[in-house]
A protein has these predicted regions:
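Extracellular/periplasmic Venus flytrap/periplasmic-binding protein
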Residues: 1-75, 115-120, 124
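Surface-exposed patches in mature extracellular/periplasmic domains of secreted proteins
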Residues: 1-4, 136-143, 161-169, 189-190
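Residue-level signal for nonpolar/aromatic packing positions in well-ordered secondary structure
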Residues: 16, 57, 69, 104, ...
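Sec-exported extracytoplasmic/periplasmic mature domains
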Residues: 17-25, 50-54, 71-78, 130-134, ...
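A structural signal for well-ordered alpha-helical segments within the folded catalytic domains
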Residues: 67, 142-152, 170, 198-199
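Extracellular/periplasmic periplasmic-binding protein-like sensory domains
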Residues: 72-146, 156-163, 217-253
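Short, well-structured alpha-helical segments that form the helix of a local strand-helix-strand
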Residues: 165-185
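Solvent-exposed, acidic/polar segments of extracytosolic/periplasmic ligand-binding ectodomains
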Residues: 180-262
Length: 262
C-alpha cells in the first residue's frame, strides 16, 4: 500500500484494510508506505513496494502526486509485477495518455467521467464541457455540476415555499434536506445524517489504451448501488466496515458494463 500521510490517505488506508479484513480475511498486508503530501519523488517507496512479491498494491494518491508515482513506477515494471488499484485516479487519465499502464483498476470517488452511466443529461454535460475545455470532464467537474444542480433544486423549492420571495438561509437548508435530484453521474440522495449528507452510486473499471481514439478507455466497469457502499442511517463508516457491511443493500440491477465505456 502507498497512501499520503494526512487525513485522506490515512482514512483511505484504514477503510481499505477494514474492508479487506471482511472480504478477503486470508489476505495479509505487506509493505505499507505513507509518504508526506506533495512528496513528488517516490523512488524509495517504489523500491520498498517491489521488494516483496505481492498480488495487489492499493493507493489513494491523487493529482500531481499520483501522476508522479505512475510515471516513476511504470518504467520499473511495478504495474506488470502486481495488480495496482488506484481509488481516485480517473482525473489523471487525460493527462497521462498512453503512459497510463493498461489493466490498472481505478475509481473516481463516484460514477464519474468514463464511468458515468449513460443518460441524456450526461450526454449533454459531456459534450458541453468537452467543447468548452477541449477535454472530457472527470470527477471534480462532475461534483461541481451535481452540487450546482442540487443548489438550483433547493432554491426553486425554497422560493416556492416562501411564495416567490427571497428565502432565508433556514428555508434554503430545509429545502435541500432529504431531497433527491438527477445529475450527470446518476441520482444524488441526501439520505444520511438526517438528510444532510449525500450518497450516490459508484463504479470501478480497468484501464486500456485505445490507439484509434488516442485515449485511455475503461473496460470491465463494475457498478455499485449507493446503499451498497455507504453505511445505513446513524451508523459510522468505521463501525459499519468492522461489522462486515451490516445492512448493505447491494442490488444486482446496478449492473456491469460488458464493453468499454465510450
Amino acid at each position: 500500500m502507498i497512501n499520503q500521510d494526512y487525513a485522506w490517505g490515512q482514512d483511505s488506508r484504514k477503510d481499505f484494510m477494514l474492508s479487506m479484513a471482511n472480504l478477503y480475511p486470508q489476505a495479509k498486508p505487506a509493505v505499507d508506505q505513507l509518504p508526506k503530501f506533495g512528496a513528488g519523488q517516490y523512488g524509495t517507496e517504489i523500491s520498498a513496494l517491489m521488494s516483496q512479491p505481492v498480488d495487489l498494491i492499493h493507493s489513494s494518491l491523487w493529482g500531481g502526486d499520483l501522476q508522479a508515482f505512475i510515471l516513476q513506477s511504470a518504467p520499473r515494471g511495478m504495474f506488470k509485477k502486481s495488480q495496482v488499484v488506484l481509488t481516485a485516479a480517473d482525473h489523471v487519465l487525460p493527462g497521462l495518455g498512453n503512459k497510463m499502464p493498461d489493466g490498472t483498476i481505478i475509481g473516481a470517488r463516484g460514477a464519474y467521467g468514463l464511468m458515468a452511466p449513460p443518460s441524456p443529461l450526461n450526454t449533454w454535460w459531456w459534450n458541453t464541457y468537452s467543447k468548452a475545455y477541449n477535454v472530457y470532464p472527470v470527477q471534480a467537474p462532475y461534483r461541481m455540476a451535481q452540487a450546482l444542480m442540487g443548489l438550483k433544486l433547493a432554491v426553486e423549492k425554497a422560493m416556492a415555499a416562501n411564495k416567490g420571495k427571497k428565502p432565508s438561509t433556514e428555508i434554503m437548508a430545509a429545502s435541500l434536506r432529504g431531497s433527491e435530484w438527477p445529475s450527470p453521474a446518476g441520482k444524488i440522495s441526501m439520505a444520511l445524517s438526517n438528510g444532510q449528507q449525500a450518497i450516490q452510486d459508484t463504479a470501478i473499471g480497468r484501464t486500456q489504451w485505445n490507439e484509434a481514439k488516442k485515449m485511455v478507455m475503461l473496460e470491465d466497469i463494475q457498478r455499485f448501488n449507493a446503499t451498497c457502499v455507504n453505511p445505513p442511517l446513524n451508523i459510522k463508516s468505521e463501525d459499519w466496515l468492522k461489522s462486515g457491511f451490516a445492512g448493505a443493500k447491494c442490488d444486482s440491477a446496478a449492473g456491469n458494463d460488458k464493453k468499454p465505456k465510450k
